[in-house]
From Swiss-Prot:
This is Cyclic di-AMP receptor A. 3',3'-c-di-AMP binds at residues 21, 25, 28, 35-37, 41, 47, 92, 94. It is found in: Cytoplasm. It comes from Bacillus subtilis (strain 168). Keywords: Cytoplasm. Binds three molecules of c-di-AMP, each in a pocket located between two subunits. c-di-AMP binding is accompanied by conformational changes of both the fold and the position of the B-loop. GO terms for cellular component: cytoplasm.
Length: 109
């Protein structure tokens, strides 16, 4: 058995949740915040049998879309400084960050 931890953008989370549950995966959905963009993410915890890991990964890949987003960099002095005028920077966001972890034991009470 494996535990898949998948971090996706909030924009992709409802579609992914529906797809996973439609394919009979049990999913726990957590609201999280990314450290780089300081924006909302959704983290899914999915317990799966070893033979279903590849199917779960393909569904996550199909439903996590990469997109470009403009962000204003944070002041190098920490916080907003009046003399620092940041220029927006385009970064690629989205997709999914996925961890597949072994599960030694699983209990359901």
């Amino acid at each position: 058995m494996k535990l898949i931890v998948a971090v996706v953008q909030d924009q992709d989370s409802n579609r992914l949740l529906k797809t996973l549950t439609d394919h009979n995966f049990r999913v726990t959905k957590l609201a999280t915040t990314g450290g780089f963009l300081k924006s909302g993410n959704t983290t899914f915890m999915i317990g799966v049998e070893d033979i279903r890991v590849n199917k779960a990964l393909s569904l996550i890949k199909e439903n996590g879309q990469k997109r470009d987003q403009m962000i204003a960099p944070v002041s190098p002095m920490g916080g907003n400084a009046d003399s620092y005028v940041p220029y927006p920077v385009e970064v690629e966001v989205g997709g999914a960050t996925v961890f597949v972890l072994p599960v030694d034991e699983f209990h359901q009470f």
